[in-house]
Amino acid sequence: MLTSITGINWGDEGKGRMVDLLSQDYDIVARYQGGDNAGHTVKNERGKFVLNLIPSGILRPDVVCVMGGGMVIDPEHLEKEITSLTEKGVEISPKNLKISDRATITMPFHVAQDGLEEERLSKTGAQFGSTKRGIAYSYGDKYMKKTLRMGDLVHMDAGVRKRLETIVESKNLTMEKIYGQKPVSVDEMWAWCEKYSKLFAPYICDVGDYLDKADREGKKIMFEAQLGALRDIDFGIYPYTSSSNTVSAYAPIGAGIPGHKLNLSIGIMKAYSSCVGDGPFTTELAMTCLLYTSD
């Protein structure tokens, strides 16, 4: 049984709450796209939980959570998120959290470049309303084959070091020539990778194989989207979109089992629209109607 839960607005529809509610009937909850640029908020008897990267099913002890290969993951933010959850009594281990070896790493220079570019564009009013979490630059470098993946943290060898050197050399052309910044240090980036290699290597695996076996065993799998359909890079209001495919059809692909078919797709919306990030309000109503609906 493969089910997807996606937003059909601009995000902020309440998907996290619905995943938390429905996940009691599922064995696995998997995120398939996005990064830490939006949050799912869940309130229960233990308090309030804000989840940016980890699937909302983590709050249920019998649910295994998967972070799919379609995601871009900032290990620094993931560490903080895990710490915040464990401090509130949520148990997290490689048994109930599995990270795809194919997921792209959001590096510190991705976050820095995002902020610098948004600042540059804002001078002429051309900014996109980025959350400045490095998401677009992580995905951009993914498609240009100029970044590392989570699986590289498992094998921190000379080959990975060489790739990192090539990546940093290319990135420094942008950071120095366009933004006038100091060059990124390869040694600092390598030390950063080594830190998170030690922390997350036990969690990293072939989640496609794990999900395929689970499906064959009859386990119930829920795919949790981040943001909404109108933020989809292909089907959203371009260019005011996110940088990934948020629609339900992408769920099996981004999670790691592209040959599988969804049995159920659930769309979440709310009575009035709000959104994550900035951008034009393309369906804004006349003031008289707006005042009426806001009362």
What are these regions (language model features)?
Residues 21-26, 47-50, 113-122, 144-152, ...:
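A glycine- and small-aliphatic-rich helix-loop capping segment at beta-alpha/alpha-beta transitions
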Residues 13-17, 37, 73-80, 134, ...:
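Conserved active-site and cofactor/substrate-binding residues in soluble primary-metabolism enzymes
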Residues 1-100, 104-107, 112:
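Basic, polar low-complexity surface loops/patches
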Residues 292-295:
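Conserved small/polar residues in nucleotide/adenosyl-binding loops
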Residues 223-285:
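Acidic, glycine-rich loop-and-beta core segments that form the ion-binding/anion-interacting portion
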Residues 15-17, 40-44, 109-114, 143-145, ...:
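Short acidic, glycine/serine/threonine-rich loops at helix termini
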Residues 197-226, 231-235, 280-283, 289:
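Accessory "access/gating" subregions that flank catalytic or transport cores
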Residues 78, 82-210, 221:
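Internal alpha/beta core interface subdomains
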